[in-house]
Amino acid sequence: MIQAQTLQHFGNGAREGDQSYFDPGAPPPFKIADIRAAIPKHCWEKSTLRSLSYVLRDVLVVTALAASAISFNSWFFWPLYWPAQGTMFWALFVLGHDCGHGSFSNSSKLNSFVGHILHSLILVPYNGWRISHRTHHQNHGHVEKDESWVPLTEKVYKNLDDMTRMLRYSFPFPIFAYPFYLWNRSPGKEGSHFNPYSNLFSPGERKGVVTSTLCWGIVLSVLLYLSLTIGPIFMLKLYGVPYLIFVMWLDFVTYLHHHGYTHKLPWYRGQEWSYLRGGLTTVDRDYGWINNVHHDIGTHVIHHLFPQIPHYHLVEATKSAKSVLGKYYREPQKSGPLPFHLLKYLLQSISQDHFVSDTGDIVYYQTDPKLHQDSWTKSK
């Protein structure tokens, strides 16, 4: 029997009965309509020209970086190029993500066209991921129905093979999980983002999934051709390493938007779950200089509740909503130029947030104290 840590305190560190006590799992005293009303009307307005200007900016930076790498092709430039280009790949992903939400423009055709280009270039199947991400937003904070970084139940956790358990809960493996998730989803779930007959998709969505998989295949074929033409080592340096940096950013950011807060946050089942309560379990993060580069994706609470708000209005919308959210909004810790401070929360969460109870409509992450002891013993 796994011995789990019992939740000792709530969202602000106070115990029940203390004057400062706050239970983050309690139903909020406001409705989602109250939050919506607090957000200025212009924050809902989408500007196609403004959105396209961000695409142009990012594509120009990606092109300039690649051209510089090809031109210099020297040992001192590559270590500078890799994190810069990988971060820009991540920025392209966020713009494609906005297309998937429809916050890029009011034209569904333009959203689909731009989204397919941006995501295919970084080997993401646009429609396959867009649909599963929609499921994530519609069911955020739900133990069984959520899609992204879903907590494992104790039963599923105990049934993991040793290798899967080690990879999931040992740094740095979790921040390289995204390509595997695209192919096979998370433990306890079945399906692939590339398979139109996966249970991720309805029959009416299959054609779009086929289109995205074909686009993904075309880009992969071009990359393989270039590898044969200019050499696999050069392509690894030009595209492969930045792709891995992009994957690290994606997993790092998405994980910490739903995990790793200073105090444990609830997950829900059954009648305790609601769209509002699930959305309030998300966490805003400050990424310093990277905030502007990756289009303010750190303003995650309001984005999760209202994904149709364009990214360039999220900061203002968040400020306006704070008066309604009260203690249900957790102010992010300020970052230096680069968000190195977040590594601490990532490592703490990976080492402590292992599973949730098989039963109960409001549950919190629990820790398996034997996990790393067993891994160490078996490795000796």
Swiss-Prot record:
Motif Histidine box-1 per record, residues: 97-101
Claim: Transmembrane is one of the keywords in the record: yes
Sequence motif: Histidine box-2, positions: 133-137
Enzyme nomenclature, EC number: 1.14.19.-
Cited InterPro entries: FA_desaturase_dom (IPR005804), FAS_N (IPR021863), Fatty_acid_desaturase (IPR012171)
Keyword field contains GTP-binding: no
Topology within the bilayer: Multi-pass membrane protein
Major enzyme class: oxidoreductase
Annotated family: Belongs to the fatty acid desaturase type 1 family.
Protein function: Microsomal (ER) omega-3 fatty acid desaturase introduces the third double bond in the biosynthesis of 18:3 fatty acids, important constituents of plant membranes. It is thought to use cytochrome b5 as an electron donor and to act on fatty acids esterified to phosphatidylcholine and, possibly, other phospholipids.
Name of the molecule in the record: Omega-3 fatty acid desaturase, endoplasmic reticulum
UniProt organism field: Vigna radiata var. radiata
Gene: ARG1
